[in-house]
Amino acid sequence: MTSFQDLGVSAPILKALDAEGYTAPTPIQTQAIPIVLNGRDLIGLAQTGTGKTAAFALPILDRLAANRKHAGEKACRTLVLAPTRELAAQIGDSFRAYGRFLGLSTAVVFGGASLFKQKQALFRGVDVLVATPGRLLDHVSQRSVRLDKVEILVLDEADHMLDMGFIHDLRKIATLLPKARQSLFFSATMPPPIAELAAQFLNNPERVAVTPPSTTAERVEQAVIHVDQNKKQDLLHALLKDKTISRALVFARTKHGADRVVKKLESAGFEAEAIHGNKSQGQRTRALEAFKKGHARVLVATEIAARGIDVDDVSHVINYDLPNVPEQYVHRIGRTARAARSGVAISFCAPDERAYLRDIEKLTKQTVPVMETDFSLAAPKADERAPRPKGPAGRGPRQQQQRKPQAAKHHASEAHGKAHAKQGHAPSRARDEGDRRDRKGNSVWSNSGAPPKYRKQRKPTR
């Protein structure tokens, strides 16, 4: 069996790995570490939980330690870009843990945290800078960081980093980097169009694919439940009554959708937290900590926000909404069955999501088993719904009244208004709304029901 020492990792890093409890490299580490140590560009494909971070962090730390030099004021030698705050923080922690005996400096910058404190951390220069693209460009615009000294560029979760939402920021950042650099892309999935885009940032890269992106993680029991969209929340409640679901990661398609799911779960008595881009950094950190410590049994997340969630004992992944990109399904269910554990992935499939399910099964080359349940999954048919009230206070159908001609209706309403006024009551606006007119016969009320604002007519000037 290959060891970290066989891969050429230095003694101080071996000591740190031993302290962290690492005994043998994973397949992605075995293949990627020698390539990175040799200074080659790399595209590394591996599912989450396979040790991607160590696959680039270990050789980078070795290279920086072997050629020690000061980066320079406000500069960095290695730049690692990540799509989310959680992933950036996790990568920063990994660099510090693996390099604890090397004396190298690491800084992490992302939105939602103090810009001033980040400027202080960057002022003297750092060996490793981990950043989200938006916050990095904030520092660039304020001249608190410079990128002309970068020797190694890393993009983690490259499939999302190079998605259209990030590509413009990345192109700006690329113009600030020296052309003579080593570039590394690591990701769980890399569809061909994204790979072509990545090639623009890499120079003759090596490609390592330990696990094909279409292969679902081992030890994950998969199931799908066909259910109408408006029954998904009730189905989720029914599933969570099963106490074997000790820690569930639920995927929602939108931020507002995630909040709605959590609100209804809490109303039903379940401990749940949401994590997505609209949450502040403090809220996201607290939600993730509550989930890790077991204070929240359910964490509802969007696709992007889930990147960087590092929790080994997730018992169930629930796709409340099926992803419209099949590779994301593979990435999602890889959040369970980590660290040699087994796990369960359950997907809710509404009628309008069946095409997504077909794409997933086509990609993975396997049929997702249908899970049988006693829960009523279909929306009630028209003749099964509760009867509507027959009339006011349930006293039976209203009497059909013959419609009055419009003119008669107008006079009747006007007469009623005058009689009402004589009794000392203000005219009813709701009753008179269609009948109040000016001298020209135009309605006085606006469409919104509010009276228009009149201006005093000015006398004509001579």
Locate the predicted segments by residue.
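Arginine-glycine-biased low-complexity disordered regions
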Residues: 245, 267, 293, 311-313, ...
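Conserved helicase RecA-like core
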Residues: 2-381
